[in-house]
């Protein structure tokens, strides 16, 4: 059984890039295109890690992280959350961390950095050399 990652992202190009990168390492990726669907997917599927865009079309990533941290689903409040966002102004990282994210990454997405951040929480089921 592989490691399950939920990526909550409304941009299809970013979704495809991350999906290809993570699936090449053996991760199983679940997709959600908005915050409400992301919260629902996290509460339904067995998730090991969440990648979270901040600028979503319905509720923002800060609210998603807050809802996940207060979820009553067993263990969900402790699932690692990596914020991946174009928000790169002073204070954005702190806001993401204070909302419940464990790590903050700014876009554009650097695949090697993504692999390193993900693997710090959940080892790759199919590791490859960079």
List PLM regions with ranges:
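Charged docking surfaces used in two-component/phosphorelay signaling
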Residues: 16-24
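Conserved acidic carboxylate
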Residues: 9
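Residues at the ends of beta-strands that form strand-to-helix hinge/output surfaces
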Residues: 98, 105-106
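Active-site residues of response regulator receiver
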Residues: 53, 85
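C-terminal output helix
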Residues: 109-118
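Short hydrophobic/Thr-rich beta-strand motif most characteristic of the beta2 strand and flanking loop
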Residues: 26-33, 41
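The feature encodes the CheY-like receiver
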Residues: 57, 89, 108
């Amino acid at each position: 059984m592989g490691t399950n990652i939920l990526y909550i992202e409304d941009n299809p190009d970013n979704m495809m890039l991350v999906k290809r990168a993570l699936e090449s390492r053996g991760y199983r990726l679940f997709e959600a295109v908005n915050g409400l669907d992301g919260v629902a997917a996290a509460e339904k599927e067995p998730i090991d890690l969440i990648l979270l865009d901040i600028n979503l079309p319905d509720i923002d990533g800060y609210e998603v992280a807050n809802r996940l941290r207060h979820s009553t689903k067993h263990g969900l409040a402790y699932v690692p959350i990596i914020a991946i966002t174009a928000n790169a102004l002073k204070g954005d990282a702190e806001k993401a961390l204070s909302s419940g994210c464990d790590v903050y990454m700014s876009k554009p997405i650097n695949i090697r950095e993504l692999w390193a951040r993900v693997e710090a929480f959940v080892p790759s089921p199919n590791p490859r050399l960079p």
